[in-house]
Regions:
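ATP-dependent carboxylate-amine ligase
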Residues: 1-40, 53, 57, 65, ...
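Short beta-strand-centered segment that lines the nucleotide-binding/catalytic pocket of NTP-utilizing
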Residues: 25, 121-133
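Acidic, Mg2+-coordinating active-site environments of NTP-dependent enzymes
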Residues: 32-34, 50-59, 63-82, 87-88, ...
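Short secondary-structure boundary segments
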Residues: 61, 127-128, 169, 202, ...
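Hydrophobic anchor at the beta1->P-loop junction of P-loop NTPases
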Residues: 97-99
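Residue-level recognition of phosphate/Mg2+-coordinating polar/acidic sites
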Residues: 106
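Conserved motor-coupling elements within RecA-like helicase/translocase cores
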Residues: 139-142
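Switch II (G3) loop of P-loop NTPases
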Residues: 145-153, 308-314
Length: 445
């Protein structure tokens, strides 16, 4: 799975550290070409012969135990490790800043890395998305700090040796692994208690409670936050705000990306810089030019008066944040195409997903993108669609389980001045490749 965002970032860092790295993925991609350019031996397709004379085989969570390369490695007695074990080994070589949360961690970890880089801290980093400023999600430097996105999905984020632990949010996600909201909250509590320095968003109820128990430094719009977001203005093209600490304004921030959630993410980066003793002037300057992360409110194009934006949002908290940002843009309408991700998440959170989508003016729900999971009887995108209708019965909604029906439907629905959002962690991101040419070819709209 070397082509995925997380594994490709790890491969990049391992190669920069001087290791010989090879890997495979199911299909060709720009990410694979980028790895090849770094001298990494990349193969398309999973085959036994790909496992050469190696010491360690690292595997992503998306790879099944029946994968031929994985089977071959185990048969030969090669050490097989997961993503978290590799990350922990890398983190052990540096002072580590780990960013966790059920939403916001990719953008926050990217911002932390970029502002510390600007402030001369020169951190190494691995994040779960391509940072637009550098065209990738990883770097290995001579600096003493390492910024890492800590994935909570399977509990392995607890293996990271964090000196600074940041929690952006905690909601009842990944219930296929944790089983309950209480269990995931307990995992985050352990994460916070394992680090000597903890930074937590005060605007998230569960995170704030866990932070109080851990003695964390807090940030957010809450009046109780140690670092308070003040005078927040959210617009189509960005956000402006001040950071207040101990009654004094310590930073005036102008972001080129929209959303109150991104103001929170940026404030987490400011707080981290303060905790590390960095100069805030270059930090604020870095945030002013922060170009975002791939698939996080990413502008894909404009045609026929319609703006198309893609986002990775796939749980209720992420959907609410993205649609809140869209709501401040002054668009004629917000038209949302949502692809549910994982059967387990759809079964557990379908009602909440639908309620979050009710913020849009027009909603299209596709069938579930199963990823690593097999279909479950009775679990389809219709669960989400029905919940969205229940939440706002007068809103226009279509359930279109077949991908080929979506663009023709949008041909008849979209109007100049609309924002069209494609949302989900699956292959819905490629819809823009078909949608934008269609919009460009229309006449009379």
């Amino acid at each position: 799975g070397i082509g995925g965002a997380g594994m490709s970032a790890i491969a990049t860092v391992l190669a920069a550290m001087g290791h010989h790295v090879s890997g495979s993925d199911l299909k060709a991609s720009a990410g694979l070409e980028r790895l090849r350019a770094l001298g990494i031996d990349v193969t398309v397709g999973h085959r036994t012969e790909n496992v050469g004379a190696v010491d360690v085989v690292a595997v992503s969570t998306a790879v099944p135990s029946t994968n031929p390369e994985l089977v071959a490695a185990r048969d030969r007695g090669i050490n097989v490790v997961g993503r978290a074990q590799i990350l922990a080994a890398i983190a052990a070589r540096r002072r580590t800043i780990a960013v966790a949360g059920t939403h916001g961690k990719t953008t926050t970890s990217s911002m932390v890395a970029m502002v510390l880089r600007a402030a001369g801290v020169d951190p190494s980093f691995i994040v779960g998305g391509d940072v637009n400023e550098i065209g990738g999600g990883a770097a290995w430097t001579a600096g003493e700090w390492f910024v890492v996105e800590a994935d909570e999905s399977d509990g392995t984020f607890l293996e990271l040796p964090a000196e600074v632990a940041i929690v952006t949010s905690v909601e009842a996600d990944h219930l296929d692994h944790y089983g309950s909201a209480a269990a995931i909250a307990e995992a985050f509590a352990r994460f916070l208690h394992s680090a000597p320095c903890t930074i937590v968003c005060a605007d998230d109820a569960v995170a704030a409670r866990l932070g109080a128990e851990a003695g964390a430094v807090t940030y957010g719009t809450s009046p109780d936050a140690d670092y308070r977001i003040d005078a927040l203005v959210v617009e189509r093209a960005g956000a402006r705000f001040r950071v207040v600490h101990d009654g004094a304004v310590i930073a005036e921030v102008s972001l080129p990306i929209p959303g109150a959630h991104n103001a929170r993410n940026a404030t987490a980066a400011v707080v981290t810089a303060v905790e590390l003793g960095a100069d805030l002037k270059p930090v604020v300057e870095a945030l002013a030019r922060f170009g975002g992360v791939a698939r996080r409110f990413q502008f894909r194009g404009e045609a026929g008066g319609v703006t198309v934006v893609d986002d990775y949002a796939h749980n209720p908290g992420k959907l609410r944040a993205v649609l809140d940002a869209a709501g401040h843009g002054g668009w004629r309408r917000v038209v949302c195409v949502f692809q549910p991700h994982l059967y387990s998440r759809t079964a557990a959170q379908g009602v909440d997903l639908g309620a979050a989508l009710a913020r849009a003016d027009v909603v299209v729900v596709t069938d579930v993108y199963g990823a690593r999971e097999s279909p479950k009887p009775g679990v389809t995108g219709m669960i989400v669609a029905a919940a969205a209708i229940d939440a706002r019965p007068w809103r226009r909604l279509a359930y279109l389980p077949h991908r080929g029906d979506i663009v023709p439907y949008l041909h008849d629905v979209l109007r100049p001045g609309d924002l069209c959002l494609t949302l989900g962690a699956g292959d819905i991101t490629s819809l823009a490749d078909d949608l934008i040419p269609m919009l460009a070819s229309r006449t009379g709209r």
